[in-house]
């Protein structure tokens, strides 16, 4: 009898111990807010991504650029040729710094942009290709810098860059190209002329021209 009684007592004590451990585990888990925090992170992350997508999809950089160009009198085909060059030069990243200099200076696109806006680098004269069309010549970068300062924007601002481009195209050096872009009905020719006359990239092969022509044709279909 004494042995059985002891076994029952031990058994009951074990049950009580298990119950107490479970109770305290639940209490601690609830009181430290861990489960609530995880839930909050999950629910806040999704709406943020959705909002970002909703904000950018209706008015893409491509659409912003196209609309400003057309408003300036450039034809549908001409605008698509310019878009094709932006695609080839920067993939429509308006803060794009020429990749070679990212590695050389050890800075990101965003860091270079911030340093430029704060006048902590010689943005105008450093020969670093920048922006949608990779402005490199000091005349182009000076024009972009002046426009940004006048408008109170960053040099990475899309509208500022497009308006700067238009003003450059109006100068005597590019007046023939500007007139051509206003009159042309060929997106492929627009892409080619803009590339050879304005961009003047190191690679001017038929393959490079063809790539930009294909981009122009695609934009022509999208915005038609």
Where are these regions (language model features)?
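Short, well-structured alpha-helical segments
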Residues: 63-66, 79-84, 188-192, 213
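Intrinsic disorder/low-complexity signal
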Residues: 6, 39-41, 48, 88, ...
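Generic signature of intrinsically disordered, low-complexity, basic-rich segments
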Residues: 40-46, 80-82, 144
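N-terminal export signals and maturation junctions of secreted/periplasmic proteins
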Residues: 10-71
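Peptidoglycan-targeting cell-wall enzymes and recognition modules
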Residues: 46-64, 90-182
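Cell wall/extracellular polymer interaction/catalysis modules
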Residues: 74
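Short, functionally critical alpha-helical segments immediately adjacent to catalytic or ligand/cofactor-binding
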Residues: 77-93, 100, 195
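Non-catalytic cell-wall polysaccharide-engagement segments
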Residues: 2, 6-37, 141-224
